[in-house]
Amino acid sequence: MTRLLSAHRKVVADQGRLLEALESALGELVRSSPSRTDCSSLEAEQCAVGCFAMDPLVAAEGEVLLCLDPADLEQERFSYLLECLHGAFLRGVTIRCICAESMINLPGGRSYIQELQTAGAEIRVAPLLPFRLMLVDRIFACVSVVDRHGENSTLEIRSPETCHFVHRVFDYCWVTRTSSKACETADAIDVSDREVIILRLLANGMKDVAMARSLGISTRTLRRVITDLMGKLGVSSRFQLGARAAECRLLWSVLS
């Protein structure tokens, strides 16, 4: 399990470097774009704007892609987003959304995910986002990035080529960097505090004898609990148990 966590950290670090490169490139694109007070003209292929425009969601016909983080959870904005997404879903629009894992860590974070699902969005969760994004029908995009100078900028894009590039980045993250099970937590899986502690001790590489001693139980009882845990999480090995526990965020759940 220790090797699994080390490998996971390396993947996250590699992804972080990739995202830094993407954000830097898009940040340069933002700075080189003309700043306009009116970006509604179809001739403007890209321009820097103050914030995401929701109006294109109302006109969505085929597909909406979103990358959301806690900045998108401002109450009035989020409520309007849900309203637009639900309307699009009723029109038959496909909606896919990658949510930053940090959203789940917020108080009531899982309820935000559930509201998005109720509105018709298919949800996946990622440790890191390439950028905040709204892409509508592959012809209009809003991308928000933090450039290498730490400045947050939003770019409105109407260029078909750039929208295609953004779509490819989203698809890559959707397939390779996200989990559809990451919204599950100890609340959704019936585990006790003692079982969560055992999972954490396993993740730290502690031997059975040492774990049993620290918990004040016999090694036989410990192994029975681990076997029961494997059954609950639907796995057949301790390695799979560690992977599934991390996937369901059991290693970081709050004990009662």
Curated annotation (Swiss-Prot):
Q: Which InterPro entries match?
A: Sig_transdc_resp-reg_C-effctor, Tscrpt_reg_LuxR_C, WalR-like, WH-like_DNA-bd_sf
Q: Which SMART domains match?
A: HTH_LUXR (SM00421)
Q: Where is the HTH luxR-type domain?
A: 184-249
Superkingdom field: Bacteria
Give the GO terms filed under biological process for this record.
antibiotic biosynthetic process; regulation of DNA-templated transcription
- Key words, A-Z: Antibiotic biosynthesis, DNA-binding, Transcription, Transcription regulation
Q: What is this protein called?
A: Bialaphos biosynthetic pathway regulatory protein
Q: Which GO terms describe its molecular function?
A: DNA binding
Cystine crosslinks: none
Q: What does this protein do?
A: Involved in the regulation of the biosynthesis of phosphinothricin tripeptide (PTT), also known as bialaphos (BA), a natural-product antibiotic and potent herbicide.
What PROSITE patterns does UniProt report for this protein, alphabetically? HTH_LUXR_2
Give the range the annotation lists for the signal sequence: none
Pfam families of this UniProt entry?
GerE
Please name the PANTHER family in this protein's record.
Answer: TRANSCRIPTIONAL REGULATORY PROTEIN NARL-RELATED, TWO-COMPONENT RESPONSE REGULATOR
Q: Which residues bind DNA?
A: 208-227
Family matches, as CDD domains: LuxR_C_like
